[in-house]
Amino acid sequence: MAGAGKTTVGNSLAKLLNYDFIDGDIKIEEKINQTIQNYLDQYGRKAFTKIEEEVLLSVNFNQTILATGGSAVLSDTAMNFLRENSEVIYLEVSYETISERIFNLSERGVVRGPGQSLLETYNERLELYKRYADHVVKNNGT
């Protein structure tokens, strides 16, 4: 979920382990040559999740930490690939903390259904995050 701390925690862990770090959102933006939010505005959720899946399926996990986008969990194909090739860690963060961390939802690139609120998006993904996780780490700190 956006605002969970995936990039911050992933980057810190990669430095600690002397691994490479990949920010999935940055890889996606490099592929589409625009911001995620612009792409979502132009092409919508379905087109974006297809691109996201392609990017995730191309990752080589040899001594690499990957911070996926929060919507990666919407693709069974991508998540099964991640579980087969890596350890999946779910950063568990309360909705209250997420909503405090995300200031401008309309510019953040959060993949949502039409008219879907942040809370509805959070609730839609919560069980999926738990289902695919090999490990759960609470991350409600600042």
Where in the sequence are the language-model features?
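P-loop (Walker A) phosphate-binding loop of NTP-binding proteins
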Residues: M1
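Conserved glycine(s) of the Walker
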Residues: G5
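NTP-dependent small-molecule kinase module
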Residues: T8, S12, L16, E87, ...
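ATP-dependent small-molecule kinase phosphotransfer cores
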Residues: D23-A72, D76-N80, N123
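Short glycine-rich anion-binding loops that position phosphate/pyrophosphate groups of nucleotides
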Residues: G69-V73, S94-E96, T142
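A glycine- and Lys/Arg-enriched "phosphate-lid" helix/loop adjacent to the NTP-binding pocket
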Residues: E84-E127
